[in-house]
Amino acid sequence: MASLPVNKIIPSSTTLLSSSNNNRRRNNSSIRCQKAVSPAAETAAVSPSVDAARLEPRVEERDGFWVLKEEFRSGINPAEKVKIEKDPMKLFIEDGISDLATLSMEEVDKSKHNKDDIDVRLKWLGLFHRRKHHYGRFMMRLKLPNGVTTSEQTRYLASVIKKYGKDGCADVTTRQNWQIRGVVLPDVPEIIKGLESVGLTSLQSGMDNVRNPVGNPLAGIDPHEIVDTRPFTNLISQFVTANSRGNLSITNLPRKWNPCVIGSHDLYEHPHINDLAYMPATKNGKFGFNLLVGGFFSIKRCEEAIPLDAWVSAEDVVPVCKAMLEAFRDLGFRGNRQKCRMMWLIDELGMEAFRGEVEKRMPEQVLERASSEELVQKDWERREYLGVHPQKQQGLSFVGLHIPVGRLQADEMEELARIADVYGSGELRLTVEQNIIIPNVENSKIDSLLNEPLLKERYSPEPPILMKGLVACTGSQFCGQAIIETKARALKVTEEVQRLVSVTRPVRMHWTGCPNSCGQVQVADIGFMGCMTRDENGKPCEGADVFVGGRIGSDSHLGDIYKKAVPCKDLVPVVAEILINQFGAVPREREEAE
């Protein structure tokens, strides 16, 4: 199947074929993960009558910044109050970060205003103060559309964390992104300049902003891709940050907002857990996308994305993104933070009314109905990308490397950059499973690449089968919201389970330190969500709620609770039991006896 070429962003037609003309609506039923919620999401296509007053925008533009109107400020959450006191983007637009960086942490803590700058507003610049566990240190999150980065960028990030010694490291995130750790405030202005010099930005990557646009990690090199997602994710990112200058029209959202563009039958991009997912589809011979909306995880509620009953052409990818963000900005809840994601707004308005609000914000105030000609083959078997695989370009291959729970040190990043230069084209690609792909490797160089010490000793293209699908959030080592330590524990538990049972196929296991579910446990075959519990002696200890049954792909499904509040020290036999009973694992002792 031919794909849309990278240099042809907006095709007038396409020869791509749909796998069938089935009804393309997903099942609107949703799996709740903590508390029961309104059934509105299940009947979203049936809109209640909406009072005209409810559709009055709650924000207005003042001096270039979008602010909440006075009449809508009753009952707002603390984050909204911080935004009203001073727009966080002023730290960037008016270079407030330079003045802030001259203050000691002691000086910062003397003023509520400065503390709010450090602990809240800096998140608009991608800086997260780790006050609880690493006082005075920051995590910095970037924008990396489609997960594509370069050896030069990787070296620069390595140079930043290297100076921080044991406090410095980097993580690959579940949105194909980099997070670097150990940053101190006085260094921030120079780091921001350094990012700009290598074509990177951290702008608008935290809090109530559009998060990193996810795309196919094999975009442009996959022999079976539907469309090259890189042009679209790049356009979305450029719009969101106004080419790294700051797009003030969408920096005061009610809550974060996650987009993705689907380019493969494999659905590597996980469309069902995004606020907006672009699903490839043709209509009247023209290439475009059907839209799914509202997928999200939170402490209170988890929902799969549902159809908007809308199709846009390739040239309307950014306009519909803009229209939806403006509708969310104008009408979304700003009270309880657990009820501020976009799906709550869809619930209240009903899908048709929400769709109408998006439509009237389109350039021509027209939003076409969904196409029946979806291009994703629903019976497609998801392919493995770890290891060596041929590209669509003759004589070239890509090599997928396993990065254990996504954690890297400076010297390892430098080595990866060197390897990308020596064996590939200087490009690296990050995946939502926290791994890295080296594309454009000449086939004649494959053997030499596989013999590199880094691949032999650390980042294997052929990891143990249970390690392949292992994902873990930051955990309590660095994150103040995490209840338990995750990364080291995920590796340790998996290693111990591997000694007990033998499995014949990968099993995706995800760890998250708290109910915010940054580790996306609900999409895993087996998921672990951190909690506090009690051991056999009644003493408090770290534990995990165990989820089972998450599915990805066209038959997506959010997992269900299997067992609550299991002490972490007791997880190994529980996991082994699940693997034997539900995934065909065999106890090692029986395997050896046979």
UniProtKB/Swiss-Prot annotation:
UniProt feature, compositional bias: Low complexity: 13-22
Transit peptide: 1-32
Entries under PROSITE patterns matching the protein: NIR_SIR
Range of residues in the leader sequence: none
Expression induction: By nitrate.
Superkingdom: Eukaryota
BP GO terms, sorted: nitrate assimilation
GO molecular function: 4 iron, 4 sulfur cluster binding; ferredoxin-nitrite reductase activity; heme binding; metal ion binding
Catalytic activity: 6 oxidized [2Fe-2S]-[ferredoxin] + NH4(+) + 2 H2O = nitrite + 6 reduced [2Fe-2S]-[ferredoxin] + 8 H(+)
Region spans: Disordered: 13-36
UniProt: siroheme binding residues: 518
This protein's record includes keyword ATP-binding: no
GO cellular component terms attached to this protein's record: chloroplast
Alphabetical UniProt keywords: 4Fe-4S, Chloroplast, Electron transport, Heme, Iron, Iron-sulfur, Metal-binding, Nitrate assimilation, Oxidoreductase, Plastid, Transit peptide, Transport
Binding site for [4Fe-4S] cluster: 473, 479, 514, 518
Cofactor list: siroheme; [4Fe-4S] cluster
Note accompanying the cofactor annotation: Binds 1 siroheme per subunit. Binds 1 [4Fe-4S] cluster per subunit.
Compartment(s) where it occurs, according to its Swiss-Prot or TrEMBL record: Plastid, Chloroplast
Protein name from the UniProt record: Ferredoxin--nitrite reductase, chloroplastic
